[in-house]
Amino acid sequence: MKFDNEQLLKYIGACTSPYHTVDTSLQMLLDSGFIELSLEDEWQLDSGSYVVNVFGTTLFAFHIGKKPEHTLRIASAHTDFPAIRVKPNPITSMKGYTKLNVEMYGGLIENTWLDRPLGAAGTVVLKGKNAFDVDSVLVDTKRPIAIVPNLAIHMNRSVNDGVKLNRQKEMLPILMMERNNEDNPTKPLNNRNNPSLFSESDTQYDEWTKFLADEVDCDPSEILSYEMTLYPTEQGCVLGTEGDFISSPRLDNLTSCFGVLSGIIQARKMNANGVRCAIFFDNEEVGSRTKQGGAGMILPNLIKRVYDALGYSNQEMDSFISKGFMISSDVAHGLHPNYPEKNDITNIPVLNKGLSLKIACSQSYAGDAKAIAIVKGLCEEADAQYQIYVNRSDIPGGSTVGSISSAMLPMRTIDVGLPLLAMHSARELMGAADQEQLNRLMNHFLGGK
């Protein structure tokens, strides 16, 4: 059966913020028969499949087979991606224009965000019963509400020579035109659901707060805080005269999330033995040093809770970890035909030739000789095409969560990922044949013997 890339594109289209990545993935797992657990409850576990929402932006799913002591396997990915985030108190004005004050999340290629219709997605936190009991609501505009316009070439003759953008000045999106007191101050954005929602006293709230209140269908006074990401509203697509490529936002790292999801669902379908886990971390793009990131204690704590609930001792758990294996999945740099000199001279991943095994003696990518050999064997058993990726010696590459998380949970780990062009652009490019190869590996690793 031919692999359906439309399912990948549908998934990416739904995952417009880390919160939505977790929500979409969680629903897929629940639909597949996983049972949701809470971090706040005591766990009573038996053979079966379970999932835990960790602080809204990280997700942990696991399957326990008939013989939990058989093997521990973990696959990881990350839910976040380079983007524009809205600051608190974001409204600023200039000569009749209303703009959003924003900051850059991660290492995005800034000029690729210019002139793109932008939607907004994330979470809005509302007043609850008391200070500790608040309500969180997911928001996705699903339509463009803002744009960062370029400066015309007639006003910037050197633009094609390369222009450095000032993030605080030139990356602020336009939201609307200012209204005076006689105009409806929220007409362009609000009143979509309830034209009479606001009273004259609502002038104490800025246009962004009013807009969010309309999206949530609440009074502006109920909004306490938010985490909102701006995202390109243009959908991903298959392209090329022979359909060889996929162009889409957020391929880094939703391709990995999609592959790991496939694997943990396969573990349930096959009732795989041992303990098979999938962890989707947040904050990889900003260093992982958070409570929900790969550099935190969340994964070791979750693994301990699983084995504690199954009645194993700490010494037995340490033994399972030392014998276990983890695959960390994050994208790699494919050969760019216009910049071939940017890749290594002998380890050159090409689009549509399979996933990349990422190797670095600096350990910016996790792995050792045995881990590399193991994952090669897994790829061969799964009939998953693979390549080797190593950075050029004179161009330092990025890092990812594999080495970070394995330092917190000492087990053999390898970094893999699909090769991309234009990584961290507002739209990235991948080979249309490659997602199937990653899914094959993850299905075999988590769902196999």
Residue locations for each model-derived region?
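N-terminal hydrophobic/helix-forming segments and targeting peptides
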Residues: 1-449
